[in-house]
Regions:
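Conserved catalytic cores of ATP-dependent inositol ring kinases
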Residues: 1-183
Length: 183
């Protein structure tokens, strides 16, 4: 796998699997860790890519083709006093095959899972997920989609009144997570 770093947050970018050549050592054991340099040098059959809006919409490839966009509803979590900001949103998950012997180009898109959102300035909701099949036709792709799985949410009521929260109101105490009470 590989990932991209954005501040303190880490975003999964790609997963490779189905290596053509064995990575077993001379003692017939798997290496404990496969560093990124060796992973990139390995000839993989399958590549799962997480598209955060940085891949072409009509003719995607395994490599990014656009700048990495920020989401309009970025948010932060704080754990042990550190801010972890989420400023990216996965738009699609792309499955690429690397089988030249099947008369398809290396990095041929075969399937995608597309996420559709209802965007707001303060929040966004996942509204549907669509699975697509892709077939390479030489210079472009032909797609067919399954019916989308759709989601509905109750809308939040955001008021102008500021309320004071107090520990006696049942708020969890501390920042280490040991005194949280699940109800």
């Amino acid at each position: 796998y590989s990932y991209r770093q954005d501040g303190a947050n880490t975003y999964l970018k790609r997963i490779h699997y189905g290596n053509r050549l064995s990575r077993l050592g001379v003692d017939r054991r798997r290496p404990l860790f496969l560093d990124e340099r060796r992973a990139e040098a390995t000839d993989w059959n399958f590549e799962l890519v997480f598209d955060y809006g940085d891949h072409d919409a009509e003719n995607p490839t395994p490599r990014e083709s656009h700048p990495w966009p920020s989401r309009s509803d970025s948010f932060s979590n704080r754990r042990a006093g550190f801010e972890v900001r989420t400023s990216r949103r996965c738009e699609r998950v792309l499955m690429f095959h690397h089988f030249e012997e099947l008369a398809m180009p290396s990095g041929c898109l075969v399937r995608s899972t597309d996420f559709h959102y209802d965007d707001g300035a303060i929040y966004s909701f996942l509204t549907s997920v669509t699975h697509k099949g892709w077939r390479h036709t030489g210079s472009s792709y032909v797609t067919q989609s399954m019916p989308p799985v759709e989601f509905e949410y109750s809308q939040p009521r955001i008021g102008d009144e500021v309320k004071v929260a107090d520990i006696s109101d049942g708020l969890p105490m501390g920042i280490d997570g040991t005194t949280y009470r699940m109800v």
